[in-house]
Regions:
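Interdomain hinge/linker elements that couple catalytic modules in large macromolecular machines
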Residues: 2, 148-325
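A cross-kingdom feature that marks ATP-driven nucleic-acid transaction machinery
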Residues: 2, 25, 34, 45, ...
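Pre-Walker A adenine-sensing motif
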Residues: 2-19
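Conserved glycine(s) of the Walker
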Residues: 31
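Hydrophobic positions on the alpha1 helix immediately C-terminal to the Walker A/P-loop
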Residues: 35, 39
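Short glycine-rich substrate-engagement loop in P-loop NTPases that contacts/grips substrate
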Residues: 55-85
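Structural recognition of the conserved hydrophobic beta-strand(s) that form the central parallel beta-sheet
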Residues: 114-120, 141
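Short regulatory helix/loop adjacent to the ATP-binding pocket of P-loop NTPases
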Residues: 123-138, 153-155
Length: 417
């Protein structure tokens, strides 16, 4: 099965021969290698590039272990270049090579080679893009399958695809399995033996139980504000473990750097400033999150919120979670100052959207809860509520856009309704 990744392929096409190193980043097993070695290579061949002018090296393979040595890898590439015609280097999982930035910088000085690399650790790569390549590194972030990509490859209708996606997520390999047990075992296996193992080895962690437990806590708390102090207290009260705030903060950073989770900052809308303390964390793939909890804690509301968050990132938006303070009456009828939560504050250039995500908004109480947050925002940027189901978008009497999840996910310009 060939899954189309047209948006990412187009990003590579428009960067071809631009004199920069194209650095494709993202969580392992999200399809970076397939994009580079299958889809992009196919495009190069169809564009008239000879096969012997495409140099392919997968550094995570045992067959290329000796090429993890920077001098040997550089010489191997030079030896493969037999003439002055253009060559295309496809280098997979570059973080396996020590001093990889020296090799790539040396290749930049060769006029007839166009370089594409993939990597699975953001800190390891992103900092070097800025400092080592001096403006000549071009990063392309790849995610697991969006729902639209998943649905296009799925053998079934929307309802079945949506149920499957909410449980097993969008890692491409999941679509290859027809049996649910295989999907579950695959996700649980790679979480432990690929992702956690990578984090432990890369950061030289000695206590695997700590990072394991931290992942479990974060998986149980997607969409809920938390911070290292709260997590530390959970360790003490439930596990009897002293786990310092600093260590927790470092370990969370390791998970973010491995693209396992994303961190959403809290933004005070009226105060126009970021506020510290409680942040929200979301999993890059909800299937991995569910696998971590052995598929017990489904929580469709929070899973749906996680999927919306990921979709917004895929579309290139900057996404924060919002708070807005306003006066409101409490249960006793007294007017008090209250803090309202806005699920997402979404920015791209001069555009801004405020988004609430509601799995079910049929009751009047739930409608009031979701809409009050939007009502108290004192500006005119677009305000939307995304609800579960297939509802077509419409505007209510207050000008808020209400749309179903299906429309949001399957229409790339859905926020422009």
């Amino acid at each position: 099965m060939e899954i189309k990744r047209d948006a990412y392929l187009e990003q590579l096409k428009i960067r071809k021969d631009n004199g920069m190193i194209k650095i494709i980043t993202g969580i392992r097993r999200c399809g970076k290698s397939f994009l580079l070695f299958v889809l992009f290579k196919k495009y190069l061949l169809e564009s008239g590039v000879d096969n012997d002018h495409i140099i392919e090296i997968a550094l995570d393979g045992i067959e290329n272990e000796e090429l993890r040595d920077p001098k040997k890898c550089y010489q191997h590439i030079k030896d493969a270049m037999k003439d002055d015609q253009k060559y295309y280097l496809l280098l997979d999982e570059v973080q396996f090579m020590s001093r990889f930035e020296e090799v790539l910088n040396s290749l930049l000085r060769i006029s007839n080679i166009d370089v594409y690399v993939t990597g699975s650790n953001s800190k390891f790569l992103s900092s070097d893009i800025v400092t080592e390549f001096r403006g000549r590194g071009d990063e392309i972030r790849i995610y697991p399958l969006s729902f639209a990509e998943f649905y296009a490859a799925f053998d079934g209708d929307y309802d079945d695809a949506w149920e499957e996606y909410m449980i097993y997520g969008g890692l491409p390999q999941v679509l290859q399995f027809s049996v649910e047990r295989q999907k579950a075992e695959y996700l649980k296996n790679i979480f432990t033996n690929v992702y956690i193992k990578d984090v432990v080895e890369r950061n030289k962690l000695r206590n695997v139980d700590e990072i394991d437990t931290l992942v479990d806590i974060l998986a149980s708390a997607i969409g809920a504000p938390t911070n290292p102090t709260k997590i530390s207290n959970t360790f003490k009260s439930e596990r009897g473990i002293n786990y310092s705030n600093k260590t927790i903060s470092n370990h969370i950073d390791y998970l973010v750097e491995a693209f396992l989770i994303s961190k959403a900052d809290r933004y005070d809308i009226k105060g126009r400033k970021y506020v510290g303390a409680n942040l929200k964390y979301y999993f890059t793939d909800v299937g991995l999150r569910n696998a971590r909890l052995n598929f017990r804690q489904q929580e469709p509301t929070h899973i749906m919120e996680n999927i919306v968050y990921n979709e917004l990132l895929i579309r290139g938006y900057n996404v924060d979670v919002g708070i807005v303070e306003a006066y409101a009456k409490n249960d006793e009828g007294k007017t008090t100052r209250k803090q309202f939560e806005v699920d997402f504050v979404v920015n791209q250039g001069s555009q801004r959207y405020y988004i609430q995500v509601a799995y079910d908004m049929t009751s009047e109480e739930k409608q009031t809860q979701e809409l009050n947050s939007l009502r108290n925002i004192p500006d005119s940027f677009k305000k939307l509520v995304i609800v579960n189901g297939t509802k077509k978008p419409w505007r209510n009497e207050e000008g808020f856009v209400i749309m179903g999840m299906k429309y949001f996910l399957l229409n790339a310009d859905s926020l422009e309704f």
